[in-house]
Curated annotation (Swiss-Prot):
Lineage: Bacteria, Pseudomonadati, Pseudomonadota, Betaproteobacteria, Neisseriales
InterPro entries, sorted: DNA_methylase_N6_adenine_CS, MeTrfase_D12, SAM-dependent_MTases_sf
Gene3D superfamilies: Vaccinia Virus protein VP39
Pfam families: MethyltransfD12
UniProt keyword terms in alphabetical order: DNA-binding, Methyltransferase, Restriction system, S-adenosyl-L-methionine, Transferase
KW Signal (keyword) present: no
GO biological process: DNA restriction-modification system; methylation
Record-stated family: Belongs to the N(4)/N(6)-methyltransferase family.
Enzyme Commission identifier(s): 2.1.1.72
Reactions catalysed, as given in the entry: a 2'-deoxyadenosine in DNA + S-adenosyl-L-methionine = an N(6)-methyl-2'-deoxyadenosine in DNA + S-adenosyl-L-homocysteine + H(+)
GO-annotated molecular function: DNA binding; site-specific DNA-methyltransferase (adenine-specific) activity
Protein name per Swiss-Prot or TrEMBL: Type II methyltransferase M.NlaIII
Catalytic class of the enzyme: transferase
Length: 334
């Protein structure tokens, strides 16, 4: 999934730097990914640690992490179920009605054919769940598979803040349900959909990885359509882009981010805390260092990487094609 702030290309670097600090044998450690997004970092550590705790306030993220982190055993008849979903006749449901041109919505997030296919698949998954034909693990596996497939054929410039006037090449391809595969192993991992500053008061562990929003862009707005597919609830889309109501993170606010971040660190019951942030974030390196040094031993490592695709396609007028990713490190002592 093409995702703002995705750590896919940085995951090996992150694993190395975290292991250099917390130890290379992590089998007895509890690892928490508090702003999990698509779960890339938690997935990297899933088979190497005792337990992963994954959290994000967005429901689409919960669905993805409930599958990639929460699921640990093979899904029975996964191939058969996906084949049946692929063969469903199209249905004119919520996605077609609100986000496809053919419905008269004046929005074009998907081709008419893909919108109807998404509806058919989403409705069937819910029916299987409600009739107990599938269990909870299978439900989230199928939902995650649908979200991944829908994202690949979305007619957007990487995020869902707006749709493109004409269907791009990838949006013309038919929806395909490629299984959202996850690592098999021991269970006991935990997945939450909660406010990070509230959840941190009720969990504890060894390694806390933080990847909060860097800037003013709200994930609930940028990925509203993934929430709509995941929730598939009755709502009224607003405006030209069809936004739904969404939660706003204080980590996207210049005036709020420092106090909420300091409160988070204060309440964290973890020995090692790692913060991913970049050189264009709302908090400066100095501000983060000042907060971390109040609670223990501080260090900083960094690496250069290429800018997220949407930054280059949405007329953001950035001067540089790359940014610096900072990994702030705290060994908490008080």
């Amino acid at each position: 999934m093409n995702y703002i702030g995705s750590k896919l290309k940085l995951s090996n670097w992150l694993e190395t730097e975290i292991s250099n600090v917390a130890g290379h044998s992590l089998s007895d450690k509890v690892f928490c990914d508090l702003f999990a997004g698509t779960g890339i970092v938690g997935r990297k550590f899933k088979t190497n640690v005792k337990q992963v705790i994954a959290n994000d306030m967005e429901y689409y993220s919960y669905v993805l992490n409930r599958n990639y982190i929460g699921n640990c055993q093979s899904i029975l008849k996964a191939g058969e179920l996906l084949q049946r979903l692929e063969q469903l006749p199209p249905r004119e449901g919520l996605i077609y009605q609100h986000y496809c041109l053919g419905s008269g919505s004046e929005r074009q997030y998907f081709s008419d054919e893909n919108g109807k296919k998404i509806d058919a698949v989403r409705i069937q998954i819910e029916e299987w769940k409600n009739t107990r034909y599938i269990d909870e693990d299978t439900y989230y596996f199928l939902l995650a598979t649908l979200l991944e497939g829908a994202d690949k054929v979305a007619n957007t410039a990487s995020v869902y803040g707006a749709f493109l006037k004409n269907l791009k090449k990838s949006a013309l391809k038919p929806l395909s349900l490629e299984p959202a595969l996850f690592e098999i192993g021991s269970d006991g991992h935990q997945v939450y959909q909660a406010d990070a500053n509230q959840l941190i008061k009720n969990i504890s562990g060894d390694i806390l990885y933080l990847d909060p929003p860097y800037n003013a862009r709200q994930y609930g707005a940028n990925y509203h359509l993934l929430n709509s597919i995941a929730l598939y609830d009755d709502f009224t889309p607003k405006g030209k882009t069809g936004l739904r109501e969404y939660s706003r993170s204080k980590y996207c606010s210049k005036s709020d981010v420092v106090p909420v971040f300091e409160a988070l660190i204060r309440d964290a019951d973890f020995q090692y805390i790692f913060l991913s942030y970049n050189n264009e974030g709302l908090m400066s390196v100095g501000q983060v260092r000042e907060i971390f040094e109040r609670f223990g031993k501080y260090d900083l490592v960094q690496t250069e990487y290429r800018r997220f695709k949407a930054d280059k396609t949405e007329n953001r007028n950035h001067k540089a094609n790359s940014t610096f990713e900072y990994l702030h490190i705290l060994e908490k002592t008080f």
